[in-house]
Amino acid sequence: MITYGSGDLLRADTEALVNTVNCVGVMGKGIALQFKRRYPEMFTAYEKACKRGEVTIGKMFVVDTGQLDGPKHIINFPTKKHWRAPSKLAYIDAGLIDLIRVIRELNIASVAVPPLGVGNGGLDWEDVEQRLVSAFQQLPDVDAVIYPPSGGSRAIEGVEGLRMTWGRAVILEAMRRYLQQRRAMEPWEDPAGISHLEIQKLMYFANEADPDLALDFTPGRYGPYSERVRHLLQGMEGAFTVGLGDGTARVLANQPISLTTKGTDAITDYLATDAAADRVSAAVDTVLRVIEGFEGPYGVELLASTHWVATREGAKEPATAAAAVRKWTKRKGRIYSDDRIGVALDRILMTA
């Protein structure tokens, strides 16, 4: 799946990060300099490889970070021969062939890619973007996050006149009431707000309760994921909610998103006056009943993932459900035991 990112690529929540480099061992400006400062051991390995003549056009130079938390691989993509020379589209074409090979061979599930050869390289973004999209269409199961050259944090536009809608109301009311319920069940969790991961799972169950929300969930790295939910949150950021920022924070950082005073007032007024208020409350009631006892990022991810394999893949027996959840990603296989998945499955079947 191809999506677009903004802000700091080095904070992208992906297994691999792509860095643009030359073939002479210099990382003196742009994103390459940021990588050099963030990963000095990677730079040392790259510099030595250049001296040995191992960094060439059309060949990725991959460095494993050795980190348990954060990106596992830095993929150095040569976009020019010398740092003084311009990039060429032929270099991008050759490199993308090898990048796809590397992603397949290393079984990389997600990757963040900068605007290759644009900016200091002198290439036109439209030409490069077309090539990136074409290349990653070969890998439909890989989450490819493409960063356009504009970069920077997302500007919050038009928030003063933001109108409450049914979809926004469901998110806000689910957030408000879930936070109250989570405080009672998991008092050690952040009291200020709830994470994007948790909101995604709340809205997954809301969509199950009322399919007219049409949120179009797909199997993501951390369970069912909806790009539309993210867009709804981004649209409310700075007005009804605060904490998402530009959306580039790592998912597992569990950065808290909370209702603003304006958001609290808006949802209170909506529920008191709008004809759809009962429908909003009914959807949220169902969500909170289903997830009771599974509050927190770990629990709601487990419950939503188990629900997905039970309803989409027909895994309604404990053994098959456990196998399906644990093979979803290596991470799920590490953190979720068969017993815990079985408990989640019991809840799903009980509330069906």
Curated annotation (Swiss-Prot):
Catalytic residues in the record: K80 (nucleophile)
Residues that hold ADP-D-ribose according to the record: 8-9, 20-22, 31-34, 79, 117-121
A GO molecular function held by the record: ADP-ribosyl-[dinitrogen reductase] hydrolase activity
PROSITE patterns with a match to the protein in the record: MACRO
Disruption outcome: Cells lacking this gene display impaired growth. A double darT-darG deletion shows no change in growth in culture, upon infection of mice, or upon exposure to a variety of stresses. Another group finds the double knockout gives a competitive advantage over wild-type cells in liquid culture growth experiments. Knock-down of darG expression leads to increased RecA expression, ADP-ribosylation of OriC and growth arrest.
Reactions catalysed, as given in the entry: an N-(ADP-alpha-D-ribosyl)-thymidine in DNA + H2O = a thymidine in DNA + ADP-D-ribose
Keyword tags: Hydrolase, Toxin-antitoxin system
Induction section of the entry: Part of the dnaB-darT-darG operon.
Start and end residues of each stretch annotated as Interaction with DarT: 164-352
GO biological process: DNA damage response; purine nucleoside metabolic process
Enzymatic class: hydrolase
Gene Ontology, cellular component aspect: cytosol
Alphabetized Pfam families for the sequence: Macro
Domain (Macro) ranges: 1-155
EC number: 3.2.2.-
Biotechnology: As expression of DarT is bactericidal (rather than bacteriostatic as are most TA systems in this bacteria), inactivation of DarG may be an attractive drug target.
Main function: Antitoxin component of the hybrid type II/IV toxin-antitoxin (TA) system DarTG, which plays a crucial role in controlling bacterial growth and bacteriophage infection. Keeps the toxin molecules in check under normal growth conditions. De-ADP-ribosylates DNA (probably) modified on thymidine by its cognate toxin DarT, which neutralizes the activity of DarT. Experiments in which DarG levels are depleted lead to cell death; expression of wild-type DarG protein from M.tuberculosis or T.aquaticus restores growth.
Annotated family: Belongs to the DarG ADP-ribosyl glycohydrolase family.
Quaternary structure and interacting proteins, as annotated: Interacts (via C-terminus) with cognate toxin DarT; this heterodimeric complex neutralizes the toxic effect of DarT by preventing ssDNA binding to DarT and consequently inactivating the toxin by direct protein-protein interactions. Co-immunoprecipitates with a number proteins known to be involved in DNA metabolism, in the presence and absence of darT; includes alkA, dnaB, dnaE1, dnaG, dus, embR, mtrA, nrdE, nrdR, polA, recA, recB, recF, xerD, Rv2258c.
Annotated domain remarks: The N-terminus macro domain alone is sufficient to neutralize DarT from non-cognate T.aquaticus in E.coli, DarT in M.bovis, and to de-ADP-ribosylate DNA in vitro. The C-terminus is a region interacting with the DarT toxin ssDNA binding region.
Protein name per UniProt: DNA ADP-ribosyl glycohydrolase
Upper lineage: Bacteria, Bacillati, Actinomycetota, Actinomycetes, Mycobacteriales
